[in-house]
Amino acid sequence: NKTVHSTTERALMCPSCGHVIYPRIVPAVIVGICNDDKILVTKYRTGFAHYALVAGFTEIGETLEETVQREGLEETGLRVKNIRYYKSQPWGIVDDILAGFYCDVDGETDIHMDESELKLAEWKTREELELQPDDFSLTNEMMLMFKNGRM
């Protein structure tokens, strides 16, 4: 039989057997790695052409904070500390839930970029930071908060 929308929760249900199918939600993090008055910005190797922040998906058995640490290390070779949750944003086009975090670089500040994933990774001061016009993404909001000295 065809599934139908449940009337009591966000799910699909088989009207014959009552089996409930819940939506799959994929958690991911966006990470503003700070180094005093600088923030680390990246550009992806393919696709999106504007500045971004370190980001990645949470693996099974991993906390969001562990994802922040792993993605920082994998994409840029940087260790991080003082991880602070900022806010979250559903990404309606797909099944992602994005969680934004700020953190501080821990120790060495030299970037060792993952060239298979990124074409650029560099520190930018608040004054140097370029934002995307009319962009309401969590990434752009986090860069704006940093640029305005509110993070």
Which ranges hold each PLM region?
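Hydrophobic alpha-helical positions that pack around
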Residues: V68, G72
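N-terminal phosphate-binding loop and adjacent alpha-helix
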Residues: T63-L64
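Cys/His-coordinated zinc-binding microdomains
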Residues: N1-K2, G18
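N-terminal strand-loop-strand
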Residues: T8-L53, F57, R79-Y85, C103-G107
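Active-site-adjacent beta-strand/loop module that shapes the phosphate/pyrophosphate-binding cleft
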Residues: Q89-H112
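Nudix hydrolase/Nudix homology domain
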Residues: F48-Y51, D114-M151
